């Protein structure tokens, strides 16, 4: 299973960096077995306001994640997610929000998480975290 962080969804719609936009969009639509996390959906819709000057708004963001949700599973947080996030926050020294996404990945069999912000060469607890914008 594969998942993307909020920034990947955001860059797919952000025309200010055409290379990142192309990379993110291609990645999203080429990933097999994708999972959308509720937190990522909410953050993406909220962040779409930053793209209003470019003709992209919350309504379009909502439409796009609904469309993506037709081919990807959607996962909602539960207490196990929060428990895992609290443990990861103290053990890995990462923010609670990042830990929540990682916890969701670990609980739902995600093997690869694509994120610009969480990039780590070592991964976390077997989860591979990949920055798709980094040159190999």
Model-derived regions: residue spans:
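Acidic, PIN/NYN-like endoribonuclease modules and their adjacent C-terminal/linker elements
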Residues: 1, 102-136
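Short, well-structured N-terminal submotif of metal-dependent ribonuclease cores
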Residues: 1-36, 51-63, 136
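Alpha-helix C-capping/helix-to-loop hinge sites
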Residues: 12, 30-31, 47-51, 68-72, ...
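Aromatic- and histidine-enriched alpha-helix N-cap/loop-to-helix transition segments
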Residues: 36-39, 96
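Short acidic, glycine/proline-enriched helix-loop-strand junctions
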Residues: 58-59, 64-78, 82-83, 90-91, ...
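Active-site neighborhoods of divalent-metal-dependent phosphate/nucleic-acid chemistry enzymes
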Residues: 72-114
């Amino acid at each position: 299973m594969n998942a993307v962080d909020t920034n990947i969804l955001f860059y797919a719609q952000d025309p200010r960096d055409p290379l990142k936009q192309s990379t993110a969009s291609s990645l999203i639509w080429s990933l097999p077995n994708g999972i959308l996390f509720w937190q990522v959906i909410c953050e993406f819709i909220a962040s779409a306001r930053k793209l209003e000057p470019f003709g992209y708004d919350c309504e379009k963001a909502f439409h796009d994640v609904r469309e993506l949700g037709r081919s990807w599973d959607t996962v909602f947080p539960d207490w196990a997610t929060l428990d895992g996030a609290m443990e990861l926050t103290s053990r890995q020294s990462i923010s609670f929000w990042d830990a929540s996404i990682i916890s969701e990945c670990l609980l739902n069999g995600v093997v690869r998480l694509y994120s610009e912000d969480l990039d780590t060469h070592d991964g976390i607890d077997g989860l591979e975290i990949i920055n798709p914008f980094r040159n190999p």
